[in-house]
Design a protein with these regions (language model features):
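C-terminal-biased regions
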Residues: 1-103
Length: 103
């Protein structure tokens, strides 16, 4: 896991949160959530995992959580996630990254 690229990826997600409409909502199978609050919550969980040395799990969970509510990312942000994983990307995560890429 590359710490520098992980931090850059998290920064991009923080930027996405700041650029989001404060009234925007996201949905998953359990309900509807304010987009800004949702992103802040998953970022908080991510930071906590990173703090405890669980960087890989933190990035995997962050990707899964934002994908579950249909948030897509630009190719530069996806590239940062790939670089954070280094040469150790599972087929599942690779598929997730492809699904999350803005078309």
């Amino acid at each position: 896991m590359n710490q520098e690229f992980l931090e850059q990826f998290i920064f991009k997600i923080e930027k996405l949160k700041k650029m989001s409409d404060r009234n925007a909502v996201v949905n998953d199978e359990f309900g509807e959530y304010n987009k800004v609050a949702y992103i802040e919550n998953v970022l908080s969980e991510t930071r906590e995992l990173v703090k405890h040395g669980e960087k890989r799990i933190a990035l995997e969970d962050l990707l899964e959580n934002i994908n579950e509510v249909g948030i897509t990312l630009d190719t530069d942000t996806i590239t940062l996630a790939r670089k954070a994983f280094g040469d150790n990307i599972s087929p599942y995560i690779e598929g997730l990254l492809k699904a999350m890429t803005c078309k």
